[in-house]
Amino acid sequence: MKYDFDTIIPRRGTNSYKWDTPEEENVLPMWVADMDFRTVPAIVEALQKRIAHGIFGYTKVPKAYYDAVVRWFDDRHRWQIDPRWIIYTNGVVPALSAIIKALAAPSDKIIVQTPAYNCFYSSIRNSGCELSANYLVYRNGRYTIDFDDLETKAADPKAKILLLCNPHNPVGRVWTPEELWRIGDICLHNGVFVVADEIHCELVYEGHDYTPFASLSERFRQNSVTCVSPSKAFNLAGLQIANIIAADEGVRRRIDRAININEVCDVNPFGVIATIAAYNEGSAWLDALRKYLWENYEYLCRFFEQRLPQYPVLPLEGTYLVWIDCRASSIGSDAMTLRLQEGQKLMVNSGTLYGPGGEGFIRLNIACPRTLLADGLERIAHVLVQNF
C-alpha cells in the first residue's frame, strides 16, 4: 500500500500547539517534535469506530493493550517483555517525573548526557534534585560519550539516576550495544539506576539498530526502567499515552505509587485504542514513514552542502530532529532563532534549550511534507548567509 506523506494537511485552527502558538498565519513551525502527517489509516478507523459509540466514560486498559505492546517489541526489537512489567501512564514526561520522585530524594543528583531533551531538566528541577552534566563529546562532526567523566559523575555518592536518551534527542545518536554496555557497567558498579527514555526508538535509519537497554542483560533489566510510547512514531502525542517497562517488582511498586500520588495514572480511551491499532497494524506505514523521513534528511543535507557548506549537519542515526552546527555564524543560536522567527517567520529550536553544550546549534524538525521542508530551508539560508 502506498502512503501519502506529500500532501500538506492544514493544521491551523485545530488548537495545535505547534501551529497555533505563533499568532501570525505565515509562520512556518519546525520546532515542536510532532509530525505534519496523518497517522496510520487503521488508527483513524479504530478511533472513528470508538467515537461512533458516543459514550466516553472511565477507561479500563484491556488485555489486548498489553498483548499489542509485548508483541510489537518482540517482533520489531527482539525484546521479550513480561506484561506484568508494563505500567501505563499519560506521557513519557509525567513518567520521568514520577520515576525520579519514586527513586531519588531531594538534593540527589541526576546524571544527564548533555545537550539533552529539555524536559529532563524540568523533571529534575521539579523533583528537587540536582543536575549532574555528563557532557557529550563533539568531535569531527559526531557525538560520543565521555566515559571517563561518566565514571567520575557516577562515583559521586549523591548520584542516584542516569537519564539515558536513546535514540538521543537532540543530537541524533543511536547508542551502540557496546556503548550501552559501558554505561550499564558503570552505573551498576556505582549504584546508579538507569532510566531510559526510548520514545524515539521506532525512528532509526538504515545502518543503525535500536537496542533496548534493558534487553542487554538480566542485571541491566533489574537496574533500569524504560519509557516508551507510540506517540513519536505514529504522531499520537495529543492522545497522551505511554508505558514504563519495569522488570524489578520492588521498583515497579515504588513507581506505581508515585504515579498514583502524582495523579498521572489515568489514560483516555483514545490513547488505548490508538496504541493497540498502531502496534497491531502500523508496521508497514512506519516503514514507509522512515523511508520518507530519511529522504527528507538527504534533501536537507544536499541543500546545506550546496548552499550552506560552512554549517555542518550532524549525522542522523535516529529521530526526525536534525542537529545543525551553526557556530560559524557571527551570532549565537538564541539570536539566530529570534531572527529566523521575526525576519523569516520560521520557528526552530535554539540549542541552548537543551542545556550545557547546546550553544551554537539549532534543532530542526523535518517530519513534514518535502515542500514545507524546502520552504523552511530557504528561510534558514536567508539568515545564515547574512550572518556568516
Can you annotate each of these PLM segments?
Residues K2-G91, A98, A278-Y279, N387-F388:
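N-terminal small-domain helix-loop-helix segment of the aminotransferase-like
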Residues S127, P157, H189-N190, F220, ...:
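Helix C-cap/helix->beta junction micro-motif
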Residues I276, Y292-C301, V313-C326:
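Conserved glycine-rich beta-strand-loop-beta hairpin in the small C-terminal domain of fold type I
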Residues S330-G332, R339-V348, Y354-F388:
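PLP-dependent enzyme catalytic core of the Aspartate aminotransferase-like
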